[in-house]
């Protein structure tokens, strides 16, 4: 694995960083990564999908019309499922817990494997200290940086040490950029990003997290 280059605001590179040895995975570990993705996606489900049954629909306390001599089929309630606005038969109810379980070691391995593959594919760039602050909370300056770095058409993941208000404001209107703290980066975040730009301080702490 080659050393990681440190990018400047003008798009040039100055300095290098050597990744830790435990990130030198030669082959991706597929199964833990797959399980971690399922875990993360299941955790996003709110479980609020619900329909009303015949007993829960309002109205229909009496027969809509008399039993006989109407020329129509007999009906007992407008809450019956075949009526428009009636109850739903076998509809979804939020009585299921969608959360999955995965051992901590397996999830850690999935994170390490996903990040290591990005390193092996030269898809990780280290940002110099306070690079993102140079945008001054301006989207235009962030676009200038992306243009200088030739990253305007890519889905990007910015990994930071601490929450930076100028960075959030400068990327808020750029849908191709996801900003995450080093301790909140998920396997899905790593895999979806075409290029990862990570602060120096965040890179050191992320290495510790992935040990």
Swiss-Prot record:
The keyword Transferase does not apply. GO terms for biological process: translation. The keyword Transferase does not apply. One of its GO terms (molecular function) is rRNA binding. GO terms for cellular component: ribonucleoprotein complex; ribosome. Residues 50-77 are annotated as: Disordered. Residues 63-72 have a biased composition (Basic residues). It comes from the Bacteria. Keywords: Ribonucleoprotein, Ribosomal protein, RNA-binding, rRNA-binding. PANTHER family: 50S RIBOSOMAL PROTEIN L4, LARGE RIBOSOMAL SUBUNIT PROTEIN UL4M. One of the primary rRNA binding proteins, this protein initially binds near the 5'-end of the 23S rRNA. It is important during the early stages of 50S assembly. It makes multiple contacts with different domains of the 23S rRNA in the assembled 50S subunit and ribosome. Belongs to the universal ribosomal protein uL4 family. This is Large ribosomal subunit protein uL4. It comes from Mycoplasma genitalium (strain ATCC 33530 / DSM 19775 / NCTC 10195 / G37) (Mycoplasmoides genitalium).
């Amino acid at each position: 694995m080659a050393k990681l280059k440190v990018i400047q605001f003008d798009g040039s590179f100055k300095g290098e960083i050597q990744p830790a040895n435990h990130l030198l995975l030669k082959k991706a570990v597929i199964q833990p990564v797959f399980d971690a993705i399922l875990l993360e996606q299941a955790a996003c489900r709110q479980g609020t999908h619900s329909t009303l049954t015949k007993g829960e629909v309002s109205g229909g306390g009496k027969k809509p019309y008399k039993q006989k001599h109407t020329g129509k089929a007999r009906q007992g309630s407008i809450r019956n499922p075949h009526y428009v606005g009636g109850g739903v038969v076998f509809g979804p109810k939020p009585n299921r817990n969608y959360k999955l379980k995965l051992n901590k070691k397996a999830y850690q391995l999935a994170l390490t494997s996903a990040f290591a593959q990005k390193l092996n594919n030269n898809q990780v760039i280290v940002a110099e200290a306070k690079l993102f602050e140079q945008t001054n909370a301006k989207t235009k300056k962030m676009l200038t940086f992306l243009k200088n770095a030739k990253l305007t058409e890519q889905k990007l993941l910015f990994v930071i040490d601490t929450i930076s208000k100028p960075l959030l404001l400068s990327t808020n209107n750029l849908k191709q950029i996801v900003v995450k703290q080093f301790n909140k980066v998920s396997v899905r975040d790593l895999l979806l990003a075409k290029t990862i730009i990570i602060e120096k301080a965040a890179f050191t702490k992320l290495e510790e997290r992935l040990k």
